[in-house]
């Protein structure tokens, strides 16, 4: 069963806390954050505690646009994108492995696309979706 971590409001998810929580998956997150913070993507990572979900979530943004949400789980981190139905054709054209993500039940008009990231091999598909989300309207 999947267990979400980072539930304590008083404990901010610093690099040390993330390293302890993710173990050998932490270098994957660290590399992703470095790559996404650089000029090509220029994304920012904003950690906030959300009382409704009772946990820390990271909102990853380009300027004011939310690109994806990141949460930390036991053995992996989860990236959740929210798309409209009109974006599905563009996502299908990205040529990403079908087993690398899950499209979850619609949430209002939004369709969640979720990656459970546990290895560096998954990052190339994730970067394709990030690039698509960044330019989609």
Regions found by a protein language model. Name each.
Residues 17, 31, 93, 122-125:
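Exposed alpha-helical structural elements
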Residues 3, 100-137:
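Well-ordered alpha/beta subsegment
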Residues 1-38, 43, 50-51:
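Charge-rich, low-complexity N-terminal segments
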Residues 18, 22, 97-101, 126:
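Generic structural signal of hydrophobic/aromatic residues within well-ordered alpha-helices
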Residues 2-5, 36-37, 66-78, 113-117:
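Charged, low-complexity, helix/coiled-coil-prone segments
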Residues 48-109:
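Short, conserved beta-strand/beta-arch hydrophobic-aromatic motifs that form part
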């Amino acid at each position: 069963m999947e267990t979400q971590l980072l539930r304590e409001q008083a404990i901010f998810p610093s690099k040390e806390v993330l390293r302890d929580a993710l173990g050998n998956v932490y270098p994957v997150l660290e590399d992703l954050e470095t790559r996404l913070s650089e000029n090509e993507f220029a994304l920012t990572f904003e950690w906030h505690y959300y009382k409704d979900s009772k946990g820390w979530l990271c909102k990853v943004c380009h300027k004011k646009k939310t690109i994806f949400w990141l949460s930390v789980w036991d053995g992996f981190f989860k990236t959740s994108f929210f798309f409209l139905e009109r974006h599905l054709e563009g996502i299908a054209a990205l040529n990403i492995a079908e087993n690398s993500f899950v499209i979850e039940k619609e949430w209002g008009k939004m369709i969640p696309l979720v990656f459970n990231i546990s290895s560096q091999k998954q990052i190339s598909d994730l970067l394709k979706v990030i690039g698509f989300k960044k330019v989609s309207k």
